[in-house]
């Protein structure tokens, strides 16, 4: 692990391990220096994380802090969006998982937004959202829900809504629907013959990459090849 540091004009490690943010120091020692560190739960007691938890609502969500436009807020699930964002911060920055009761509450809130089809819906009103569905799934997997049947259901939905080329796109975009119009419409089915979106496919693949079984699936490999084909165009 040390050889790569010799290739750099400036060694970043001293700055990282002397950072005031204890989480940065922790993961630098653990993931970069391969040092033995204290249990991850030590990060859960940091004041930064506790401050975030103080804003959690009774239903497990976090309230969106902005004002927004009222006619859009009535159609978009802003609290789901904010809870997704906050969960990402807690999981990725502080290593929290479902051993913590407040993470379980947040997960329960997000799972309450999962439909019978398997997608997580509401951020685009009634419309399908492979990107947000997969992004939420990625965080839930990292939080310890990889073996949960609701995650399996989500993957089955993602596989069912692929474009014919093997990638993903936002369904209402494939029929050229305007965003504001889509928010007020019934579910818009995708035109699967349209080409995949490299942006959406990249987000969806993050959920596959986080899952022990699905990361090696032929569908993930195919989508990865498609995504790689868009590099340096």
Q: Where are the language model's segments positioned?
A:
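Preference for long, amphipathic alpha-helical scaffolds in soluble/luminal domains
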Residues: 1-233
């Amino acid at each position: 692990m040390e050889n790569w540091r010799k290739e750099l004009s400036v060694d970043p490690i001293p700055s990282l391990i002397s950072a005031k943010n204890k989480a940065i120091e922790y993961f630098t020692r653990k993931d970069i220096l391969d040092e033995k560190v204290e249990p991850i739960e030590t990060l859960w007691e940091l004041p930064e994380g506790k401050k975030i938890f103080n804003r959690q609502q009774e239903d497990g969500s976090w309230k969106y802090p902005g004002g927004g436009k009222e006619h859009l807020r009535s159609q978009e699930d802003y609290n789901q969006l904010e809870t997704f964002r906050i969960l990402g911060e807690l999981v990725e920055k502080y290593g929290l998982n479902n051993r913590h009761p407040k993470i379980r509450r947040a997960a329960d809130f997000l799972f309450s937004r999962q439909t019978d089809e398997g997608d997580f819906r509401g951020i685009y009103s009634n419309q399908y959202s492979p990107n947000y569905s997969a992004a939420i799934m990625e965080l839930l997997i990292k939080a310890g829900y990889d073996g949960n049947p609701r995650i399996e259901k989500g993957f089955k939905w993602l596989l069912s809504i692929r474009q014919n080329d093997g990638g993903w796109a936002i369904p209402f975009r494939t029929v050229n629907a305007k965003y504001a119009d889509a928010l007020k419409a019934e579910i818009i089915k995708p035109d699967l013959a349209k080409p995949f979106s490299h942006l959406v496919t990249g987000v969806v693949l993050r959920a596959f990459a986080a899952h022990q079984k699905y990361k090696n699936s032929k569908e993930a490999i195919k989508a990865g090849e498609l995504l790689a084909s868009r590099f340096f165009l």
